[in-house]
C-alpha cells in the first residue's frame, strides 16, 4: 500500500495540474479533483503575563485537504466535495470528522443568471486575496484578514458578478451567545450578498451579510422578555496586478459586529502553533437584556512577485482591533509573514512561511514566531 501511495505521489508530481476528466462530450462533463496539504515546522510562543514560553515541533495534515466531483449536464451543474475535517449539518457534532465541504446543484438561465441550492461558500468568503497558510490557510483571519471559506447550506442567485443568498443559521457553526439566553432562540435566515469584478489585471470584491437572533432571558428568573442580537459584516478586497501579472498587491478590509453568530470573524492569539486560539469567542447578554456587542475592524495587505515560473516571494501583514463591551479594554492583534512558494510541478508545491504574531490584551501580551512549510499536492 505504501509503495502504491508513493508511486501515485510521484506520478502527480511529474504531470501538469489538471482535474481527472471522467467524461466529457461538450454538453455533459464529469471530473474528479482534490488536494492534499500537510505541514512541518517549528513554533515559539511567549505569554507576557505568566512569563512562560512554549516551543513546539509542528507537523500534520491540514483539515482542508479534500477530494470532490464536479459535473455538468446541459444547464445543470453540481459539486460534491469531502473534506478531511468539516462540519456538515450541525456544526460541532461532526466538526472533527470527514464531512461534506460542498454539496450543491445549480441551474443556469443563460444571461439571466443561475440559481444554486445546497452547501457552498457564502458570498462573504474572501478567498484569493491573502496567501497566509497559518490556521488552515486562514488568510490572516483574526490578524487583519477575513474568512477565506465559510460553507453553509443556502439558496444563492448569481448574475453578472452579483451574488445574493439566503443562508441557514446553524448556531453550532459559531459559538453563538452566552449569558441570559435559554437554549432556544429564533433566528432569521442570514442574508449575504457580494459583487465581484475580475479581469486579467484586477480583482475587486465587495461583500456584506446580516443576521439576527432573538432569545428569552432566563436570569434572574424566567419570563417572556426578549433580547435581540444583531450581527453583520462588510468586506472589501482589491487586488491589482502589474508587470504582466508578475507582481500583485492585495488590500483587504473588514468591519463587523457579533460575527460569532455565524462564525466568519474571530478575536485570536497564537501560541506558537499552526492554529490560532480564540479570545472570548461568544456574544454576552446580560440579565436585563443588554447585549455585550463585539465589534471588529481589520485590514490586511499583501505584496507578491513571481521571480520566475517556479518561485515567488510574498510579504504580507495585518491588524485587527476588537472592541468587546464586556471587557474594560480593547484587543489588538497583528501579524506579518514572509512566504516563498516553490512550484515543483503543476501538481506539487512547497510553501515555506515565516510568521510573527502579537496580541495585546490590556497588560497581557502574547507573541509568537512560527516557521513552517506546507507541502501541497493538487489534481
What kind of region is each of these model predictions?
Residues 75-79, 111-116, 160-164, 201-206, ...:
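Repeated loop/turn-to-beta-strand initiation elements of outer-membrane beta-barrel proteins
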Residues 40-50, 86-90, 123-127, 170-176, ...:
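Gram-negative outer-membrane beta-barrel proteins
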Residues 1-29:
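Cleavable N-terminal export/targeting peptides
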Residues 63-67, 100-105, 151-155, 160, ...:
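Hydrophobic, lipid-facing positions within transmembrane beta-strands of outer-membrane proteins
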Residues 197-338:
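Detector for outer-membrane/organellar transmembrane beta-barrel domains
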Residues 342-344, 366-379:
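Outer-membrane beta-barrel "beta-signal"
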Residues 34-42, 80-84, 117-121, 164-168, ...:
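Transmembrane beta-barrel strands of outer-membrane/channel proteins
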Residues 21-42, 54-172, 185-187, 192, ...:
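Outer membrane beta-barrel
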Amino acid at each position: 500500500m505504501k509503495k502504491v501511495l508513493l508511486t501515485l505521489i510521484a506520478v502527480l508530481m511529474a504531470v501538469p495540474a489538471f482535474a481527472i476528466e471522467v467524461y466529457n462530450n461538450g454538453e455533459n462533463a464529469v471530473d474528479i479533483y482534490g488536494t492534499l496539504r500537510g505541514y512541518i515546522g517549528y513554533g515559539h510562543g511567549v505569554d507576557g503575563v505568566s512569563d512562560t514560553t512554549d516551543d513546539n515541533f509542528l507537523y500534520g495534515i491540514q483539515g482542508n485537504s479534500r477530494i470532490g466531483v464536479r459535473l455538468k449536464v446541459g444547464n445543470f451543474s453540481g459539486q460534491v466535495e469531502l473534506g478531511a475535517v468539516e462540519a456538515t449539518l450541525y456544526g460541532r457534532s461532526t466538526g472533527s470528522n470527514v464531512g461534506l465541504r460542498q454539496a450543491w446543484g445549480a441551474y443556469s438561465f443563460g444571461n439571466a443568471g443561475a440559481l444554486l441550492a445546497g452547501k457552498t461558500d457564502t458570498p462573504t468568503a474572501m478567498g484569493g486575496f491573502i496567501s497566509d497558510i497559518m490556521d488552515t490557510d486562514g488568510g490572516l483571519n483574526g490578524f487583519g484578514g477575513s474568512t477565506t471559506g465559510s460553507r453553509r447550506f443556502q439558496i444563492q442567485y448569481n448574475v453578472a458578478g452579483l451574488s445574493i443568498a439566503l443562508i441557514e443559521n446553524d448556531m453550532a457553526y459559531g459559538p453563538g451567545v452566552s449569558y441570559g439566553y435559554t437554549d432556544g432562540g429564533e433566528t432569521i435566515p442570514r442574508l449575504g450578498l457580494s459583487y465581484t469584478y475580475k479581469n486579467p489585471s484586477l480583482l475587486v470584491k465587495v461583500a456584506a451579510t446580516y443576521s439576527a437572533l432573538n432569545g428569552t432571558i432566563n436570569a434572574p428568573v424566567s419570563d417572556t422578555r426578549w433580547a435581540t442580537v444583531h450581527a453583520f459584516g462588510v468586506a472589501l478586497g482589491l487586488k491589482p496586478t502589474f508587470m504582466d501579472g508578475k507582481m500583485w498587491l492585495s488590500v483587504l478590509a473588514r468591519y463587523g459586529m457579533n460575527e460569532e453568530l455565524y462564525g466568519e470573524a474571530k478575536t485570536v492569539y497564537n501560541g506558537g502553533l499552526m492554529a490560532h486560539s480564540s479570545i472570548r469567542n461568544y456574544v454576552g447578554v446580560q440579565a436585563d437584556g443588554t447585549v455585550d456587542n463585539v465589534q471588529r475592524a481589520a485590514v490586511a495587505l499583501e505584496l507578491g512577485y513571481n521571480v520566475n515560473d517556479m518561485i515567488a516571494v510574498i510579504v504580507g501583514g495585518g491588524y485587527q482591533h476588537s472592541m468587546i463591551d464586556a471587557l474594560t479594554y480593547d484587543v489588538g492583534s497583528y501579524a506579518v509573514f514572509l512566504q516563498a512558494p516553490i512550484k515543483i510541478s503543476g501538481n506539487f508545491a512547497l510553501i515555506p512561511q515565516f510568521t510573527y504574531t502579537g496580541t495585546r490584551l490590556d497588560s497581557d501580551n502574547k507573541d509568537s514566531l512560527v516557521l513552517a512549510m506546507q507541502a501541497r499536492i493538487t489534481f
